[in-house]
Amino acid sequence: MNQLNISHNWKIKSFTSITFCDHCGSMLWGICTQGFQCSDCNFSAHSHCTNLVTLHCNNNKNNSKPNEKPATITAAAASSSTTTTTTTETSTNTAASTTTTTNNIDIKNKDKTPTTSPFSSPILSSYNNNSGNEFCSNRQHKFHKTSKSITKFCNYCRETTFTISGEPVMCSECRYIAHGHCQTKVPLNCIIPYSSPINTINDGGNVRHHWVEGNLKKSKKCIHCMEPCEKSFSLAHYKCLWCHKYLHSSCFDKHNPICDFGSLSDMILPPSSIRLLSTTATTTNKIEKLIIEEQQPQLSSSPSSPRLNINNNNNNNEIIEWELIENSNMPEKVLFVFVNSKSGGQFGSTLIRKLSSLLNPLQIIDLIKCGGPDSTLQMINRYLAKHPEQTNRFRILVCGGDGTVGWLFKQMTKHLVPSTIPIGIIPLGTGNDLARSLGWGIGYDGEKLIEILKSINEAKTIQMDTWSIEMWDDDKPEDRRVIEMNNYFSIGLDAMVALGFHLARNANPQLFTGRTVNKLWYTKIGLEEFVTKNFVSLARIVKINVGTREIRVDRSIEGIIILNLGSYAGGVDLWGANRKDNQTHSDGTGNQFIDDQTLEIVGVTSLPHLGSCLSSISSPIKMGQADEIRIQVSMPSIILKDKSNEIETAFQVDGEPEPIEVRNCTFKISFFKKVSMLSNRSFKPRIENHDSDLSTFQISQSPNLYSPPSFKNPPPNLNQYQQPHQPPQSQPQPQPQPQQSLQSPQSPEPINNNTNNNNNNNNNNNNNNNNNNNNNNNNNNNNNNNNNNNNNNNNNNSNNNNNNISNDLTNNSEVNPEKSTNNEKTNDNNNNNNNNINTPFEPISLPDENNNNNNNNNNNNNNNNNNNNNNETNSEKSYTNNCDEVD
């Protein structure tokens, strides 16, 4: 058994090189005998600083036996001059032995009385190295190689790492730095991320600071005296791993030991909220075995608790089994980070190390080493099953590409994790279209993570549509496969190029090292496909149906892309920018949103056409918009005979391509659910409902039976898709009987009844407006004529809106549009008539029909007596002609 000697063994020394004091950080001046140095721990100090040093000497490197592990020393209470310490000695023949002793320690050298403090200041903490203890205090560092620098110092021998010796190492969790030859001698004092009596005060469960000495990257104010802690060429001053605040060495025994977790307190999971269940690891060192050896550590198949697989410098795998504690210390926005360490070249593993030093290491889940997110998602689900009111306290951050995000969506659905938990993204993939659509940039490139985490903390929550793709072989319809889609689905030309890129990357993954290199390879493979292959015309093999209607595929189209987002292939907007006030585009199509339960369909004619679209030189062919799509692929026998050894066509979902190897197959794309996403607050996403509420969200159960192209109001005979609507209180309420007639499915003409009833109910309300509108022309008319004009004008407005709906027009009023005040009132009345109608997608409008309908509207205004009959007939004919043109 060793007895710790805390006092430094000071000896005067003449330094042959420039040396700085390890206490105050100033240079040791003089030609000779510049200061003192501890002969045991190499602590250098001025003569006047030796009485003020608060760091205790770790001299067991000279007293320990060859096979012993040095005792662990960290911060503890120092309000008195006596403290309880524990030492551990490990023998080669025994697994572990524990001895506890009590020593009288002189905190200050030369019998100087320590400064008293109102706080219980953490100065020295001796870990209880009991192998049977549930809380494993002796926690190993997770070292990885780091660069040499003259400003980096070994926390063990206190010498600079800028030497000719081996590569220095750094702990990825506590930033402890050591030389390669000092690595096996460092104390086991890594940060404890779970509940433990070592770092948690008994009253209230508050967490103490975890101080690491020296190696400050920049100057900050001391949390006690508020004077700057200057960066020094020594191990002077301290930095807390939880709140990242600084503390002077001279203020170490005066500060408040309770940590507030700093600027990231809303997302850091405190150790007091985590209960450690078990710890399992494999080690190569001959130390006390506080954890069980396993030849091949794997995740437990039991879903009882999550496990985290962590790798350290000795190839030791540590699996920690833990659960959340039900207490009041749970932060407002707990963040669980899922990292794909294979994404983004070396950025994945680098992110894990950086995030582990900013958050609780247990919040970081390596999807590759941990075998996926299953265990963590199960733990979250079990906790929320007991506390559903705390769902809004959880957030998820995915570090990876779009494929990683899609994988996490699938696992969340599998483990019944609420889709209301918002998800943020740090993009590490090649295209990163989903991250671009939410304002998180084109890809992570070494930016400051603390600023990114602050942006995640301040992000706004929006809704995004997700879709399910059901596919089957027509010869075996019982064998069906379902894939979730978030970004896009494509078939034909671009999927063939993506498949060639995918096969080349799997064959030589070492050649695809980054986003820029991947895009160059993608271009090269696309040119090879263009030269060596003839892409089949999709009109020969593909049929696209929306409900019972078929969309005609032009003979020139070789690729069809179905979009959910406004970003494709690395940020290309194929559909085009949205118009203000939801106005239709010049081609009659509507705006694109990520939360409108509508997909956009575009086509490309050739590989040069696709390249020009990706370069924003030209635009694709807009084929329409839809909420449910069925694609039938039928390979003619002549094609299979001519090219039996080649892949005729392929499809891809969110950048994951697959060949179509069957003769006849079917794809059915339908709305699945909405998920909550985190959008950068400085970015304006393409969302239709800015104040969406999941509690009032309704999923359309029936597919629309009409052609997909776009406008936001339905044809007049879509009574089966009407949704009940309550008008605002500021507007006149309809009578109960007309409202019942509107919603009744047995009404023979529900749309016309709605129009007539609204005309009757709003007749008096519009009386004054129409009288004002017709003052110049109808001064001599009597009240009866005014009433007739009111009815006719209202009928014109409602029926004209129906005509505009069926032809994708946006006119809301036909009475004196030059008068803004009256126009606004008329628009409000028209909105009341049309808000009761809701459909997920809208048919295309044709230019000739728009002109005809405008002529019909003018005729209706001139012929008031025939409005009711003519408008209804014109609406039905207009919509019938529209469907015939699309067919």
From Swiss-Prot:
A single BP term in Gene Ontology: cellular response to fatty acid
Bias (Polar residues) occurs at 114-123, 805-820, 872-887
Q: A single GO molecular function, which one? A: nucleotide binding
> Where in or outside the cell?
Membrane
* Enzyme class, broadest EC rank: transferase
Query: What is the protein name given in its UniProt record?
Result: Diacylglycerol kinase A
Cite the annotated pathway. Lipid metabolism; glycerolipid metabolism
Pfam families, per this entry?
C1_1 (PF00130), DAGK_acc (PF00609), DAGK_cat (PF00781)
Q: Which species is listed as the source?
A: Dictyostelium discoideum (Social amoeba)
Biased composition of type Pro residues is found at 725-737
Chief location of this protein within or outside the cell: membrane
Give the gene that encodes this protein: dgkA
Function, as annotated: Diacylglycerol kinase that converts diacylglycerol/DAG into phosphatidic acid/phosphatidate/PA and regulates the respective levels of these two bioactive lipids. Thereby, acts as a central switch between the signaling pathways activated by these second messengers with different cellular targets and opposite effects in numerous biological processes. Also plays an important role in the biosynthesis of complex lipids.
Q: Which UniProt keywords apply?
A: ATP-binding, Kinase, Lipid metabolism, Membrane, Metal-binding, Nucleotide-binding, Phosphoprotein, Repeat, Serine/threonine-protein kinase, Transferase, Zinc, Zinc-finger
| Superkingdom of the source species | Eukaryota
Summary of subunit composition and partner proteins: Monomer.
Q: What is its EC number?
A: 2.7.1.107
Q: Which InterPro entries match?
A: ATP-NAD_kinase_N, C1-like_sf, DGK, Diacylglycerol_kin_accessory, Diacylglycerol_kinase_cat_dom, NAD/diacylglycerol_kinase_sf, PE/DAG-bd
Q: Where is the composition biased (Low complexity)?
A: 64-102, 738-804, 828-839, 850-871
Residue ranges of the DAGKc domain? 330-473
Is Lipid biosynthesis found in the keyword set? Answer: no
Question: Per the record, what are the reactions this protein catalyses?
Answer: a 1,2-diacyl-sn-glycerol + ATP = a 1,2-diacyl-sn-glycero-3-phosphate + ADP + H(+)
Question: Membrane topology for this entry?
Answer: Peripheral membrane protein
The record's section on PROSITE patterns has:
DAGK, ZF_DAG_PE_1, ZF_DAG_PE_2
Q: Where on this chain are zinc fingers (Phorbol-ester/DAG-type) annotated?
A: 7-57, 140-190, 208-259
Q: Which family does it belong to?
A: Belongs to the eukaryotic diacylglycerol kinase family.
